[in-house]
């Protein structure tokens, strides 16, 4: 129990803090953002293996890169499609970067079929070829998925494989744990980023992760 003097001192401190916050309301969103960043970092650290370990060949760049950039994407997401050349530029500009792709099919039934096909491609060592071919083929449909698979030399036998079902479920669960609210979502270091971002912002996050 606090003595009378200690209680009075605590009350004075609380009043100073209260008055400061009232006079500087801009610190509230800053404090909330800092708390959110801390919580995000803890969530990433707790799930890093599931986040950064690629499924088959669903990765690009330097396999021994010192920083891993992870993209959670949906094949029916226009912003994900628009990010494709940016990722290629990042890899060209940063020889120490590894990129891991994680299917997060949340937008449509076609998204889910496309995700299964891309994971089959990853199992067969042909992820990037399928990934590029499907994005180049216009809106996602059964026909465009088949065309991309044919172009990449991917067999679509095994779309309902339990291993692929488990991989998609794991990605969904991880996205919930990380409070992701859409695609594309990015993880680099301990940071979670959302949306179609300029390459400079991604590079800034990569540099921060590298400096840790």
Can you describe what each PLM-predicted range is?
Residues 1-107, 163-182, 204, 211-212:
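Extracytoplasmic thiol/disulfide redox context detector
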Residues 105-212:
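Cysteine-centric redox/oxidoreductase cores and disulfide-bonded domains
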């Amino acid at each position: 129990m606090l003595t009378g003097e200690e209680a009075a001192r605590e009350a004075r401190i609380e009043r100073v803090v209260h008055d400061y916050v009232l006079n500087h309301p801009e610190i509230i969103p800053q404090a909330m953002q800092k708390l959110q960043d801390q919580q995000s970092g803890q969530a990433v650290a707790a799930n890093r293996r599931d986040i950064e370990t690629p499924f088959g060949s669903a990765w690009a760049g330097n396999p021994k890169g010192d920083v891993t950039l992870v993209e959670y994407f949906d094949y029916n997401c226009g912003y994900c499609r628009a990010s494709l050349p940016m990722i290629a530029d990042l890899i060209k500009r940063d020889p120490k970067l590894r990129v891991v792709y994680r299917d997060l099919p949340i937008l449509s039934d076609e998204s889910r079929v496309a995700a299964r096909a891309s994971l089959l491609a990853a199992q067969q060592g042909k992820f990037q070829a399928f990934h590029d071919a499907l994005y180049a083929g216009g809106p996602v449909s059964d026909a465009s998925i088949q065309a991309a698979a044919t172009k990449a030399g991917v067999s679509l036998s095994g779309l309902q494989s339990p291993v692929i079902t488990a991989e998609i479920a794991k990605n969904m669960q991880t996205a919930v744990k990380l409070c992701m609210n859409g695609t594309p979502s990015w993880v680099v270091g301990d940071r979670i980023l959302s949306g179609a971002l300029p390459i400079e912002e991604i590079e800034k996050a990569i540099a921060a992760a590298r400096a840790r």
